[in-house]
Design a protein with these regions (language model features):
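Active-site histidine-acidic residue metal-binding/catalytic motifs
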Residues: 1-57, 63, 85
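Boundary regions of SH3-family modules and the immediately adjacent low-complexity/disordered segments
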Residues: 230-246
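SH3-family beta-barrel domains
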Residues: 178-196, 209-213, 221-223, 244-246
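Structural recognition of the beta-strand scaffold that forms the well-ordered cores
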Residues: 3-8, 43-46, 66-71, 88-91, ...
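Long, well-ordered alpha-helical scaffolding segments within enzyme catalytic domains
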Residues: 28-39, 96-114, 151-180
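Active-site-adjacent mobile loop/cap segments within catalytic or ligand-binding domains
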Residues: 4-14, 63, 68-77, 121-179
């Protein structure tokens, strides 16, 4: 299953027009993303507010991630304070996968961002979280927090933004988007055989491991006849015919 490093802003010193700050709202978006990530089977690690950008980069580079995803909001230059608007998603020049992810994210953000200009994807050499990460990287600037309309949009749209970004991640990784549901527990009933945990909801997909008959699993979501499950820290799809909810 896909595995991302989720890096919401730790910049509490960036105030929002109308109250709050960048660290607060970006971490609220990350919090709201977590149930969607789990239901979709996207594994993740996350920074914490005590870390700085260099530490987030180091933590990302210490793992094997399929995407580094940074969550931020923007600020206008002093001479244009409060005047600029719109989402921008950055990637590093030459990072083809980072570019692909950023374009998908920008296109989907344009569907929910209510003002002009629409979201766009741009390359940059000035952001370490795209130029210094081992994994492909996208750095989202959701909107301008010094603009009264943009700041209010972020503040009022936490859940909508979180869902939209995870839809983009599912599109990027080529997996189904699954709305969160209450986490359940199931018991495997496979007549003595091991039940495969697969990377896609298909019997043709690669098996990441097996669940022994009688074992219990955590169920995060469902698409068709497949559950998104976790067993022994392995996350993937398992055939629902062989799992009984308990």
């Amino acid at each position: 299953m896909p595995n991302i490093y989720l890096s919401p802003s730790t910049q509490e010193f960036n105030p929002y027009n109308g109250g709050g700050n960048e660290e607060l709202y970006m971490n609220l978006i990350a919090d709201a993303m977590e149930p969607f990530l789990r239901s979709c089977g996207i594994e993740f690690s996350r920074n914490n507010p005590q870390m700085n950008a260099a530490q987030s980069i180091a933590a990302s580079n210490a793992g094997n991630y399929d995407l580094h995803l940074a969550l931020h909001s923007n600020a206008s230059p002093d001479e244009l304070s409060g005047q600029l608007q719109g989402p921008v998603v950055y990637y590093a020049p030459g990072d083809t996968e980072g570019q692909r992810a950023s374009v998908i994210i920008a296109n989907n953000l344009s569907e929910i961002y209510p003002y002009s200009p629409p979201a766009r994807a741009e390359s940059t050499t000035n952001i370490g979280e795209v130029t210094q990460t081992r994994a492909p990287a996208s750095f989202i600037e959701f909107a301008y927090h010094d603009n009264v309309l943009d700041a209010a949009w972020i503040r009022d749209s936490i859940d909508l933004i979180a869902e939209n970004v995870v839809v983009s991640l599912c599109d990027y990784f080529g997996i189904p988007f699954i709305l969160p549901s209450p986490v359940r527990t199931g018991k495997v009933n496979s007549d003595g055989a091991y039940l495969n945990i697969r990377t896609r909801p298909s019997t043709a997909a690669y098996s990441k491991g097996g669940i022994p008959d009688g074992a219990t699993v955590t169920i995060y979501g469902q698409t068709g006849n497949w559950y998104v499950v976790e067993y022994n820290n392995i996350v993937g799809y398992a055939n629902a015919d062989y799992i009984t909810i308990i």
